């Protein structure tokens, strides 16, 4: 059987009898189904321990179909991290766009950045895994940098618009964004690791006070 024929056969594969979800019909939907399953497996086991077989079983598809879309495990890991974090970036931008004032936009970003609930915690577990995997895998490192820059870029845009509107005073929005994103990373990591005495409310208070000090604005009560 030729490689082309084998790939076509894999793409037509139906849901496995042991699969936990029903495969979607279009190629793009099949790809998303696999990525969603990979995200779940990677959150539970870590990217190093996750196997393609585990992902195929979780997605309810054949092993061959996973390889049809993602030839190597490294391809799958990088694509999963880009997909999961990309959804978060899109959600962030939509929520921020719905706010009017600069401080409301900033507070929306801070609340979305700090884990709250199972879904947000899972996203951070995957993000921390990406930090670790990026030390060894250049592709994952580039994906991580790309998505980190997207978050930081949104923050810079918020600060710039606030300065233009006269809400903020900030001589260097890029530097302020670096300070705030670094603080978010460190504090959110402590929350994900369930460090004693660290709460989401306390982290948000620290972030709001720091942001207000950096931007010459009184933090919300």
Whereabouts are the PLM-identified features?
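N-terminal intrinsically disordered/low-complexity leader segments
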Residues: 1-29, 219-221
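Hydrophobic/aromatic-rich alpha-helical bundle segments in the mid-to-C-terminal region
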Residues: 139-145, 149, 163-211, 218-221
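Hydrophobic alpha-helical connector segments
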Residues: 79, 90-123, 176-180, 204
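Amphipathic alpha-helical segments used for helix-helix packing
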Residues: 105, 118-142
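Generic hydrophobic, amphipathic alpha-helix propensity
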Residues: 30-38, 55, 80-84, 88, ...
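Small-residue (primarily alanine) positions within well-ordered alpha-helices
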Residues: 37-38, 59, 162, 177
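Helix-turn-helix
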Residues: 33, 41-75, 79
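Short coil/turn segments at alpha/beta junctions that flank glycine-rich nucleotide-binding fingerprints
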Residues: 44-48, 99, 120, 165
């Amino acid at each position: 059987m030729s490689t082309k024929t084998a790939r076509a056969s894999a793409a037509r594969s139906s849901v496995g009898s042991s699969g936990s979800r029903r495969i979607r019909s279009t190629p793009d939907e099949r790809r998303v189904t696999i990525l969603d399953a990979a995200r779940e497996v990677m959150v539970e086991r870590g990217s190093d321990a996750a196997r393609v077989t585990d992902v195929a079983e979780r997605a309810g598809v054949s092993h061959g179909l996973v390889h049809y879309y993602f030839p190597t495990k490294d391809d799958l890991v990088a694509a999963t991290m880009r997909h999961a974090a990309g959804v978060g970036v899109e959600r962030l931008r939509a929520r921020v766009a719905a706010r009017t004032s600069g401080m409301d936009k900033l507070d929306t970003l801070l609340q979305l950045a700090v884990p709250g609930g199972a879904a947000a915690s899972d996203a951070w577990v995957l993000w921390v895994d990406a930090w670790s995997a990026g030390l060894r895998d250049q592709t994952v490192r580039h994906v991580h940098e790309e998505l980190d820059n997207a978050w930081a870029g949104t923050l810079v845009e918020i600060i710039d618009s606030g300065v233009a509107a006269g809400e903020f005073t900030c001589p260097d929005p890029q530097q302020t964004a670096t300070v705030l994103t670094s603080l978010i990373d460190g504090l959110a990591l402590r929350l994900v690791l369930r460090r004693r005495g660290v709460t989401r409310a306390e982290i948000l208070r620290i972030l709001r006070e720091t942001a207000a000090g950096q931007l010459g604005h009184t933090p919300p009560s």
